[in-house]
Amino acid sequence: MAEITLEPSDLMAQTNKRIVPKFTEIFPVEDANYPYSAFIASVRKDVIKHCTDHKGIFQPVLPPEKKVPELWFYTELKTRTSSITLAIRMDNLYLVGFRTPGGVWWEFGKDGDTHLLGDNPRWLGFGGRYQDLIGNKGLETVTMGRAEMTRAVNDLAKKKKMATLEEEEVKMQMQMPEAADLAAAAAADPQADTKSKLVKLVVMVCEGLRFNTVSRTVDAGFNSQHGVTLTVTQGKQVQKWDRISKAAFEWADHPTAVIPDMQKLGIKDKNEAARIVALVKNQTTAAAATAASADNDDDEA
């Protein structure tokens, strides 16, 4: 994800601005009678109300990206014992942060960065790019599902300080199949468990909204005891959502265009892109938030 540089006037406006979400969608995570697919469909329906149609593009196009986000929505993920609220930008579907039951907002970033959330948020201490969350691993290594979402919500809801959640939970997690990997990761990075929980939510919620393929894959295995993962190809496509969106605009003007980097992703034309991607990022304005190149999104979350 490209870096965003805010002007002093933008900083002042954001500091004094309280976020008012356009809608809040509640997902009862442990309710087996409420399918993941219904949750994603409901959120998409509300997001589409703020999208536009673009001639030659099959999918709805998100609002133009802004340096200081103007449009937000919340998703409240509720388990039997706890809940967290995710703050998501409408213009690019990025997860910016989450709120605990105690009313504390945790935001991606660190000291010296500029807050986008109101209500005195705290920094998580790391960014929201996939490079920040999983390093050089592929997204096919991220295990998802109803049980994974439940654990993520319950653990993140207890977050009080920047690096203590991992220290408190790692012993309990030693009984999990990936315990050895978690223990090794926690030893190298005290934030490893928080990052692991967040990347699961980013893929299940944000990428589930962006991608038909992701939402279908997650839905098919959401109730599986062993969880569900993306394919290698799906993971690579997810990390190129911005570029796929740009290609959708190119195909709108030149329907028969051959776009080599799309072919590498298994996307030969706009029909194939529409099968894979549900919502397209707006490319019509040179928003400062987008920066120099759409190809910088290799590890955006």
From Swiss-Prot:
In Gene Ontology terms, what is one molecular function of this protein?
toxin activity
Residues forming the catalytic site = E207
What InterPro entries does this protein's entry cite?
Ribosome-inact_prot_sf, Ribosome_inactivat_1/2, Ribosome_inactivat_prot, Ribosome_inactivat_prot_CS, Ribosome_inactivat_prot_sub1, Ribosome_inactivat_prot_sub2
What keywords is this UniProt entry annotated with?
A: Cleavage on pair of basic residues, Hydrolase, Plant defense, Protein synthesis inhibitor, Toxin, Zymogen
Q: Which reaction does it catalyse?
A: Endohydrolysis of the N-glycosidic bond at one specific adenosine on the 28S rRNA
Q: Which Gene3D superfamilies match?
A: Ricin (A subunit), domain 1, Ricin (A Subunit), domain 2
GO biological-process terms attached to the record: defense response; negative regulation of translation
Q: Which residues form the propeptide?
A: 1-16, 162-186, 258-301
Tell whether Hydrolase is among the UniProt keywords: yes
Organism's domain of life? Eukaryota
Q: Where are the transmembrane segments?
A: none
Q: What is its EC number?
A: 3.2.2.22
Main EC class the enzyme belongs to = hydrolase
**Family that this chain belongs to:** Belongs to the ribosome-inactivating protein family. Type 1 RIP subfamily.
Q: What does this protein do?
A: Potent catalytic inactivator of eukaryotic protein synthesis. It may be a component of natural defense mechanisms involved in protecting the kernel against soil-borne fungal infections.
Quaternary state and interactors: Synthesized and stored in the kernel as a 34 kDa inactive precursor. During germination, this neutral precursor is converted into a basic, active form by limited proteolysis, which removes 25 AA of net charge -6 from the center of the polypeptide chain. Additional processing also occurs at the N- and C-termini of the polypeptide. A two-chain active RIP (comprised of 16.5 and 8.5 kDa fragments that remain tightly associated) is produced from this processing event.
Would you tell me the protein name for this molecule?
Ribosome-inactivating protein
Q: What organism is the protein native to?
A: Zea mays (Maize)
